[in-house]
């Protein structure tokens, strides 16, 4: 059995580690609430914009319209946009996205497509650049709660690559935030856009309402498309191309912002859970070490008593 000093040092080290993990858990818990609220607040706008595009499609002949973001062409090159975090200590959050990106990369290259990567977050950047993957662009240092400016910077780069025919399809790989204890990596086609299939059937519908005199966001019930239909007698001054060129870039930027926000919320929730588990494990380990310390101390005392008794008997 280890000596008493070694056990005392280990107990002290474990308790100090627990203080750190507990502090990180509290920080993550405070930040995740803000990130969660940001995710919920952004959803009504995204939902409403998707419904507007759906209804416009039903009123106007978008299939005859021409927009760079809707251009369907033979797919030869595909860009994967992978969203991870800048830091670790968040359970399997980063590893799950990296694994899903590798799987998708292997699937596409196995079918003969040329694949390029756009990496968001230091974890993805560090992993893929060290393994000689074809990296098109990298972005890091995003805010804990991503902003529209950050999403616009990334979407502008991706959009320019698509319009310039540098890529034929763009897929987004990010972590969908479900709740504080559940999230999942998903793959979503970002470009080309299709107004006939603009809404994700798995998306919840969120509405901005008032409760007790305050604005709040609540999940909506009922059919997916709850947007009032556009009356058939309305005449639009703009052509379908003008409407699409105004709305689709906004929709693209919003989709990217939403994915960044959901990923950030998922990262913080994963970190909170990981630090909570680490704190619990440290507490249990400290208990076990304390028990070992007491046993070792008791054995040492017993040994000393036996030695004293043996010496007294020898003298007597």
UniProtKB/Swiss-Prot annotation:
The keyword Transmembrane helix does not apply. CDD domains: F1-ATPase_gamma. GO terms for molecular function: ATP binding; proton-transporting ATP synthase activity, rotational mechanism. It is found in: Cellular thylakoid membrane. It comes from the Bacteria. One of its GO terms (cellular component) is proton-transporting ATP synthase complex. Keywords: ATP synthesis, CF(1), Hydrogen ion transport, Ion transport, Membrane, Thylakoid, Transport. Coiled coil: none annotated. PANTHER family: ATP SYNTHASE GAMMA CHAIN, ATP SYNTHASE GAMMA CHAIN, CHLOROPLASTIC. NCBIfam families: ATPsyn_F1gamma, PRK05621.1-2. Belongs to the ATPase gamma chain family. F-type ATPases have 2 components, CF(1) - the catalytic core - and CF(0) - the membrane proton channel. CF(1) has five subunits: alpha(3), beta(3), gamma(1), delta(1), epsilon(1). CF(0) has three main subunits: a, b and c. This is ATP synthase gamma chain. The gene is atpG.
